[in-house]
Amino acid sequence: MSQKLVLILNCGSSSLKFSILDPQTGEEKLSGLAEAFHLDDARIKWKLHGEKGNADLGAGAAHSEALNFIVNSIFPLDPSLKEDIVAIGHRIVHGGEKFTSSVVITDEVVQGIKDAVQFAPLHNPAHLIGIEEAFKMFPHLKDKNVAVFDTAFHQTMPEEAYLYALPYSLYREHGVRRYGAHGTSHFFVSQQAAERLNVPAEQVNVITCHLGNGASIAAVRHGQCIDTSMGLTPLEGLVMGTRSGDIDPAIVFYLHDNLGLSVEEINTLLTKKSGLLGLTEVTSDCRYAEDNYDKEASAKRALDVFSYRLAKYIGSYMAVIGERLDAIVFTGGIGENSSLVRELTLNHLKLFGYQVDSDKNKAARFGHEGVITADNTPVAMVIPTNEELVIAQDTARLCIA
């Protein structure tokens, strides 16, 4: 009996992540990554029914060549795959204010994604390429393509949370406000937390920490986002792999006036040379800092700044939630796997009663989840994220009868 499967596309400026899921069971049939687009060593790797494969795409290859390879070289390894795909879900980083939920892609939706390019100049153009290529490769599914927006979950933020203290005309005329990111992940783990804590989803109060190379935190009250750390762009907020997060805005002028850096150079410094990379002066990889925390002053410095900033945000979000807090949730590559980051962060929150259970905390990694705080103390927990499943389920909800 044929299945109803969803193809998920996550197009970046130089890469394409793809997967095929059963939206009902969550079973992953195919997953893969095509990367190094526009370079001499463009390549693709995949896992089909547990079997791994890889290939070169050819010098200069990009999204079109990658999708061609998927359809013409990977799909034939299991001919039923293409036949069973009934819809396509696209991860879209920025939807501006226009999109508050996932939508079937129409000409109007495409225009809305184009309008938000100014807020995600690297990501949204790549998403548009992915949509165009999907229309070409799967013409029979043109009305079964769904856009799932990373910004949508944060559209419930109140005005006092999303406005900057800038001339209001900048918001009114140019849309300058806080939008957030990682919304699909924050939504998923908040819902999962509600289920694990036996709290109705519409009543759950959690602080969700999506920690990876990009990192953000969200305050979720009664199942809805009321604040998040990323802003107009994904540069604001927490310390990240190569991004600075929050800084004094006047540092930009200082770098220009005193060091002679151009706007482009400052942008590169803040987005690609800062964060853990800037603090360690070695790497953006949190695993290096964790492994060398007790050996290298730079590694300790990086994780201390990272966890201190995170704890400050958690404390402030406790205030804005303003009532019962059901849990602090850690997710993302660092959140799910770095017991040290979790311990350092929660140690800053002892005033609120948080007490790490060392054994539980160290056991919660590599896909293992659960509560990491001591019994009879406030709950902090690890929940692996699954953005692909959310995209598949939203796509199925809109397209599959």
Swiss-Prot record:
GO terms for cellular component: cytosol. CDD domains: ASKHA_NBD_AcK_PK. Mg(2+). Can also accept Mn(2+). Mg(2+) binds at residues 10, 387. Substrate binds at residue 91. It is found in: Cytoplasm. Keywords: ATP-binding, Cytoplasm, Kinase, Magnesium, Metal-binding, Nucleotide-binding, Transferase. Pathway: Metabolic intermediate biosynthesis; acetyl-CoA biosynthesis; acetyl-CoA from acetate: step 1/2. Its main location: cytoplasm. The active site is at residue 150. The keyword Oxidoreductase does not apply. One of its GO terms (molecular function) is ATP binding. Catalyzes the formation of acetyl phosphate from acetate and ATP. Can also catalyze the reverse reaction. Belongs to the acetokinase family. Homodimer. This is Acetate kinase. It comes from Pasteurella multocida (strain Pm70).
